[in-house]
Amino acid sequence: AAEKEGVTNFPIHIKLDTGMHRLGFAPHDVPELIARLKRQTSVIPRSVFSHLAGSDGDQFDSFTRKQIETFEKASEELQSAFPHKILRHICNTAGIQRYPGAQFEMVRLGLGLYGVDPYTNQMLHNVSTLKTTILQIRDVPQEDSVGYSRKGRLNRDSRIAAIPIGYADGLNRRLGNGNAYCLVNGQKAPYVGNICMDVCMIDVTDIDCREGDKVVIFGDALPVTVLSDVLGTIPYEILTSVSNRVKRIYYQD
């Protein structure tokens, strides 16, 4: 594309496959890559990078060290062929923490930007909160059920609140039926019955609350890692599942 536009020395970023086998040039392709780059003037390498496959797991330490070693050798080979400085980066959030010697000229902080440590699965400093408000509260007798397929069964007469958030907003259906909870006025309110598309129900029997009160799905007091642990997944999935129809508000200190 650069050649067709008559552009010269357009900076590009070169990805190396050091073991994740997703994208990138294999290390043994580097000599041919250098030769092709040398035969043209449209683009020049600005940076070279790779991705660590298991930097957040102790069991993968030997593999991670091998990846770093492979990357270092291949990037040195590329650098030696060009007079200008080529930036190197391979560390993700866990890599930054666990392999400081592999930070090179740049790093790529991913999940850490959102205050989550993928190595310990603990919070650093939370920066995101998903919240809603109570839409309606009703008294439901023990013998009745709540939600679709009558999945929400009660062990006592209960106060059930409906909140306007559902799986179309990114609230996973597997959190329903008491598998997880949200916070109402700082107290745990379990999800009752199936999570619906636009609404879900929570048990507020023992909570002093009223319609319009704030409900925290995840945030400072309820880390996103709690939900990811329940679902057997990673915090990334929870955060990226929040749909576009959920209003975003950005704060700047």
Predicted regions and their residues:
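Active-site loop/helix belt of alpha/beta enzymes
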Residues: 2-11, 18-133, 137-141
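Acidic active-site catalytic centers that drive phospho-/nucleotidyl reactions
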Residues: 15-17, 51, 185, 198
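Conserved beta-strand segments that form the floor/walls of ligand-binding pockets within enzyme
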Residues: 13-15, 47, 108, 162, ...
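C-terminal accessory subdomain/extension
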Residues: 139-253
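Glycine-rich loops and low-complexity Gly/Arg-rich segments
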Residues: 16, 36-41, 71-75, 113-116, ...
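Short aromatic/hydrophobic contact patches that present stacked aromatics
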Residues: 13, 19-22, 162, 201
